[in-house]
Amino acid sequence: MITSVNVLGLNARNHLFLSFNKKEGRRVADSKLLTKRILRRNHLPTPAILAIFRSPQDIVNFPWERLPDNFVLKPSKGFGGQGVVIVKKKAKWAGEWYLMDGSLVTTQDLRFHALEILSGRFSLHNGVDIAFIEERIKIQKIFAKYVWHGAPDIRILVFNKVPVAAMLRLPTRESKGKSNLHQGAIGVGLGLATGITTHGVLNGRFIKFIPETKRKINGLKIPQWDKILTLAVRAQEVVPSLGFLGVDIILDKNRGPMILELNARPGLEIQNANWSPLKKRLERVEGLEIKDAEHGVKIAQALFAERFADRVMAEEGIKTINAVEKIKILAGDKNKIETEAKIDTGAFRSSIDRDLAERLGLLKEENILWKNRFEYRSAVGLQPRPVIGFTFWLAGRKIQTTASVSNRSKMNYPVLIGRNDLMGFLIRP
């Protein structure tokens, strides 16, 4: 497992960040039905509800034989995947279905389970609950070879309207088609900038291949990635009393990303799946002024871009560069513009000359991540520098990062590359 002072532990999570979740927000997240009601009211996609059972009489009177071939029976206030029954398909006789593990379930079994839900057996706070039946999502073809049975989902951690980490959760035979890590599902880290899978963790162990297959964990690109991230932030926007939350999103074959549920107390295994501690990420975005969901996604992808430095070094060898190098900058019109840059490990963040940034179209409002957060000391005191999204190529390697904008007209080079963007390089003196 990763070891670092920046790893977020349960105590730090509870003390430092769960305080951003107010009572009303926790009440919404703890009720799947209330969450769905708010999502639908704000026109955010979520799987349809087929039936709601508030009393034993509702369960007895419900026409179970009219249910579709597959569906999901859930507790409204359940947690950790407990109490969820995933029905795969109808069996030969009426009133019988197969579960994900091939076992048979009858109408009588489902009624009894629904009564168990109402009694509070699976409730987060051990109180009475509501049972409901939800449509079962048809998964996209891209996932078919990565799951045993069941539908994978994507957990996005959102703090201050910025996605700070993401994880694909793959159901396994052990998890019986469910995507909960504590029941045996696989957690797979996702690069925030790309939506590409990176590292896998199963029952606390790192893995490189899907169990019972030779299929690699890394390298799978999640479709509609920016839309998924934006949807996660919008979920926080409609429940603003949840400042730090997990958003579970599923990809429907025909309708695209849909929100399954919100989690006011997200687990921390996502750090292991990404090989990246959370504490520093959360501190970097705390207090930023985020205009909207798209702005939050842009900041996340600039700050937390997956560099794959270790993999690149393993495959290509360490690249040696000079103190001054030619780079290509991705301009606002998507053209690549070549210029010279100074390589400076004494500076943390890269910077670009204001006039050059203006000519390249990088100072447009949608590319400015923040204006007043980053300051430098000048003859007239502390001066704010805007920070922009910045993509460039150095020694054939693409780097997606952030850069401060300053007046470099009296400098020899219009761009400075700081040590934050020099992982995997050796600098020739």
Which positions does each model-derived feature cover?
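Active-site nucleotide/adenylate-binding loops and adjacent lid/helix of ATP-dependent enzymes
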Residues: 4-21, 25-153, 160, 346
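Short, His- and charge-rich active-site/binding loops that engage polyanionic ligands
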Residues: 84-110, 159-206
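A long amphipathic alpha-helix within ATP-dependent nucleotide-binding catalytic cores
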Residues: 118-148, 176-252
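Short, surface-exposed charged micro-motifs
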Residues: 155, 248-250, 340
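Short beta-strand micro-motifs enriched in acidic
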Residues: 157-159, 250-254, 406
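A short, polar/proline- and glycine-enriched secondary-structure boundary/capping micro-motif
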Residues: 174-183, 269-273, 361-364, 411-415
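C-terminal active-site "lid" helix and adjoining low-complexity regulatory extension at the edge
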Residues: 214-223, 251-317
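Pepsin/retropepsin-fold aspartyl endopeptidases
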Residues: 284-429
